[in-house]
From Swiss-Prot:
Serine/threonine-protein kinase involved in somatic mitosis and female meiosis. Required for spindle organization in mitosis, and for the establishment or maintenance of meiosis-specific chromosomal configurations, including the prophase I karyosome and the metaphase I spindle. Specifically phosphorylates nucleosomal H2A on 'Thr-119'. Required for the development and organization of indirect flight muscle sarcomeres by regulating the formation of M line and H zone and the correct assembly of thick and thin filaments in the sarcomere. This is Nucleosomal histone kinase 1. The modification Phosphoserine is found at residues 376, 381-382, 388, 390, 483, 564, 586. Residues 47-328 form the Protein kinase domain.
Length: 599
């Protein structure tokens, strides 16, 4: 790498003054160049200066065009002669980034494009009486910083992997010429401007480019901590330029582009380079666990493979670029993202687990409103689930029900939509037939599950005459059990009568009448909305004692109470083999037994 000649030893006093003078000029900002100024390069080419399009750490960048042309398709980077970075960058371009050499590398490796910029011209010019050095390069588009800011400091996963492949191509080109870049970051990666240019990213700013070491590892205090502190490598912290250091810098950037925050940034150590160095050493010494901390939901496989590989490289070992690229290429295939076309920087909306059955993007408020409309829980027959109901709730439901026409459940209902609750039941694994849900204390409204799209047959049972029964029992612990046998028959007005035929002999003249709707299928749970309807004739009637002794005692003790019943609902799918009393039972017929007892 070119070095500035040392002052002669004969004048030591002058040496000190000269050193101080040089230090005062080091990295001085350039003079402002007026728009329309013409620069003449070493090859006598003339370039018209356009508007300023950016200011770097030590120089300013202007749009430019050849004199006589109108398209500002080039840029001029201008710095005072005393500045070092542009001097290094210019000589790197002149020696290693000729357009012919770039094309030859692309042809050798079968590349359609390479993110390696090249120099168009260079020269010196006086601006406001001060000598400046300038270089002319092709003009590129926006840098990645713009997209990171737009997307909340992250990039789409597929785009990150494509950028990794493209930067590895540039690294391979530079390393093949004996140089390392040492300062890869989002601000130094630009997109192309020409037709199809958005498909290729270009690595720029070679102000820290230098020859990498191939011999012994010798730290250089003068070069310690060179680079951008967030991303500079462990070797660069010691002042040693290596090829593995370039890959390590790339890895830190990839982690950040995927939305994770580097530990030394989180810990706010950037103002103290030695602490950053120690944090990076600890991070790379146990890279597997370190990455798990940054990606608690799972480390992206290509990132894990790449960083583990980098951590095992020796300081003078040539990286296996093909192996590194293959990890990112495989990830792109799994994501079904092609490694061509324009780079996509639009973040896709992340889909939730959708546990509340709301579509992606549904607001929480809208989901809450929909949840209030869902009244029927998915029942767990293995657990004694209790569903509370109050008299006020029933009166409100009766009033709202009078305004609507009850929908009749017919066995031949077809093309019906599946209710949200049905979806929850279907999504559960076979071994877990039902999911327990806790009741809400708020008033519940009726849900309306639709009929199954497949026809189902129900046994025809002759209507049984109803006789006066005892006054309606309203006990606080009354429960309703649904278990294996049921006979259904339809009635006008959307009513269905459920007859208990669990015992060999039907209970004489005993029926329960409910307003409810069923949604039954071969592989789904039964969802039942039950509403108790008060009848005047039942309030004064006497009950028929056809229950077991335990249930009779429970009823006797609960007859004095006036609170609303608490229901316990147990459901299970029918195996399709009914008894002789129900010869017409279909496998799709729900099985329900209705009981009341004190819990």
């Amino acid at each position: 790498m070119p070095r500035v000649a040392k002052p002669k030893a004969a004048a030591p006093a002058k040496k000190v003054v000269s050193a101080k003078k040089a230090k005062s000029k080091l990295y001085k900002m350039p003079e402002k160049v007026k728009e329309g100024t013409v620069f003449t390069d070493l090859a006598k080419g003339q370039w018209r200066i356009g508007p300023s399009i950016g200011v770097g750490g030590f120089g300013e960048i202007y749009a430019a065009c050849k004199v006589g042309e109108k398209n500002y398709d080039a840029v001029v980077k201008c710095e005072p002669h005393g500045n070092g970075p542009l001097f290094v960058e210019m000589h790197f371009y002149l020696r290693n980034a000729k357009l012919e050499d770039i094309k030859q590398f692309m042809q050798k490796h079968g590349l359609k494009s390479l993110g390696m910029p090249y120099i168009l011209a260079n020269g010196s010019v006086e601006v406001n009486g001060e000598k400046h050095r300038f270089i002319v390069m092709p003009r590129y588009g926006s840098d990645l910083t713009k997209f990171l800011e737009q997307n909340g400091k992250r990039l789409p996963e597929g785009t990150v992997y494509r950028l990794a492949i493209q930067m590895l191509d540039v690294y391979q080109y530079m390393h093949s010429n004996g140089y390392v870049h040492a300062d890869l970051k989002a601000a130094n990666i630009l997109l192309g401007l020409e037709k199809g240019g958005a498909a290729q990213a270009y690595l720029v700013d070679f102000g820290l480019a230098s020859h990498f070491v191939t011999g012994d590892f010798k730290p250089d205090p003068k070069k310690m901590h060179n680079g951008t502190i967030e991303y500079t490598s462990r070797d660069a912290h010691l002042g040693v330029p290596t090829r593995r250091a370039d890959l390590e810098i790339l890895g830190y950037n990839l982690i950040e582009w995927l939305g994770a925050e580097l530990p030394w940034v989180t810990q706010k150590l950037l103002a103290v380079p030695p602490k950053v160095q120690k944090a990076k050493e600890a991070f790379m010494d146990n890279i597997g666990e370190s990455l798990k901390t940054l990606f608690p939901k799972g480390v992206p496989p290509p990132i894990g493979d790449f960083m583990k590989y980098v951590s095992k490289l020796t300081h003078n070992q040539e990286p296996d670029y093909d192996k590194c690229r293959s990890w990112f290429s495989s990830a792109l295939k799994q994501l079904k993202i092609p490694n061509n076309g324009d780079l996509d920087f639009k973040m896709k909306p992340q889909t939730s687990s959708n546990n509340n059955l709301s579509p992606p993007g549904t607001s929480k408020a809208a989901t809450a409103r929909k949840a209030k409309k869902i009244d029927s829980p998915v029942l767990n027959s293995s657990l004694d689930e209790k569903i509370s109901a109050s008299e006020d709730d029933e009166e409100e439901e009766e009033k709202s029900h009078r305004k609507k026409t009850a929908k009749k459940v017919t066995p031949s209902a077809r093309n019906a939509k599946v209710s949200p609750l049905k979806r929850v039941a279907d999504s559960s694994p076979p071994s877990q037939k039902r999911v327990k849900t806790e009741p809400k204390s708020t008033p519940r409204e009726r849900a309306t599950p639709k009929a199954s799209p497949k026809p189902r047959s129900t046994p025809k049972a002759s209507p049984k005459p109803q006789t006066p029964t005892a006054a309606r029992l309203r006990t606080p612990n009354a429960k309703i059990n649904f278990s294996p046998s049921i006979s259904l028959r339809g009635r006008p007005g959307g009513k269905t009568v459920i007859n208990d035929d669990l015992t060999p002999q039907p209970r004489s003249k005993k029926t329960y009448e409910f307003n409810f709707e069923l949604d039954v299928s071969m592989d789904a749970n039964v969802i039942v909305n039950v509403k108790r309807k008060k009848k005047a004739d039942q309030d004064k009637a006497t009950a028929v004692d056809s229950r077991t002794p335990s249930s009779r005692s429970a009823l006797a003790s609960s007859s004095k109470e006036e609170a609303s019943p608490v229901t316990r609902v147990n459901l299970r799918k029918v195996n399709g083999h009914g008894d002789s009393s129900t010869p017409g039972r279909s496998p799709r017929t729900p099985a329900v037994t209705v009981r009341k007892y004190q819990g």
